[in-house]
């Protein structure tokens, strides 16, 4: 059985174009393993749009996010931190999942 991950629809085009190559998640989604292939769907309607391969899963604190992380998310560092705070309010311990579209 294939494992799945969802993304907000606003990220779909960046993932498909290879502009978004990481996702930052909380501990509940830190269990993915390098080499694992995931089905990717939109969070809002659960419509499948591609597969990704997990390359790495690395812990990071909110204040440890860098311009490099922001580039991999296809946004500025300020935008990235704001999005993370909206999705995970009050959470500081996160995980960077690096992936490649298949």
Swiss-Prot record:
Entry's Gene Ontology molecular function annotations: hydrolase activity, acting on carbon-nitrogen (but not peptide) bonds, in linear amidines; N4-acetylcytidine amidohydrolase activity
GO cellular component, one term: cytosol
EC code: 3.5.1.135
Keyword Nucleotide-binding attached: no
Transmembrane segments: none
Annotated InterPro entries: AC4CH, ASCH_domain, PUA-like_sf
Active site positions, chain numbering: 20, 23, 73
Function: Catalyzes the hydrolysis of N(4)-acetylcytidine (ac4C).
Name used for this protein in its record: N(4)-acetylcytidine amidohydrolase
């Amino acid at each position: 059985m294939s494992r799945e991950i969802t993304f907000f629809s606003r990220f779909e085009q960046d993932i498909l174009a290879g502009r978004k190559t990481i996702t930052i998640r909380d501990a509940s989604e830190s269990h993915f393993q390098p080499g694992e292939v995931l089905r990717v769907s939109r969070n809002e309607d659960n419509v499948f749009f591609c597969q990704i391969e997990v390359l790495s899963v690395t812990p990071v604190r909110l204040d440890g996010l860098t311009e490099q992380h922001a580039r991999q998310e296809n946004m500025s560092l300020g935008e990235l931190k704001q999005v993370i705070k909206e999705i995970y309010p009050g959470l500081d311990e996160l995980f960077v999942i690096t992936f490649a579209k298949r």
